[in-house]
Amino acid sequence: STPIKSSAASDVYKRQDMMNSEIGFGRRILQAFEDNGISFEHVPSGIDTMTVFVHQDEFMDKEQNVVAAIHRLAKPDMIDIEGDLALIAVVGRGMRSTRGTAGRIFSALAHANINVKMIDQGSSELNIIIGVSDGDFENAIRAIYNMFVLVQL
């Protein structure tokens, strides 16, 4: 079976045109969290975006300090903060050699009417991290479990 873990979180989403070509942008963003004593849970990024997932309870009291530090250190075009998120890690050694695993996960979530807010799969293909609303967490776990454990395709 595939182990499933989660973590309640807030995400801090930053956007800056051509962020990927600016040396040190990611380090400066993470510096703002480090300077405020906040560790990050997950950091997916794209060409123009970077999202930092942190534990909501660690972040709430320091939000304004972190946002001010990000503006000062990295000067992003935009910062957006969303709370009450849950991260689910679908993990398994067999994922790398099994076709359709991601499709089965997202089909199960769609059939359960769960909106996926974030997807990240590393090149190792050993896990897929999925972000959903905290209120959808239990139903998401149930849908994924049912797809992989109860339904044998």
Regions found by a protein language model. Name each.
Residues S10-L153:
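A conserved regulatory-domain signal marking ACT and ACT-like small-molecule sensing domains
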Residues S1-Y13:
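Single conserved hydrophobic/aromatic residue that forms the stacking wall/gate
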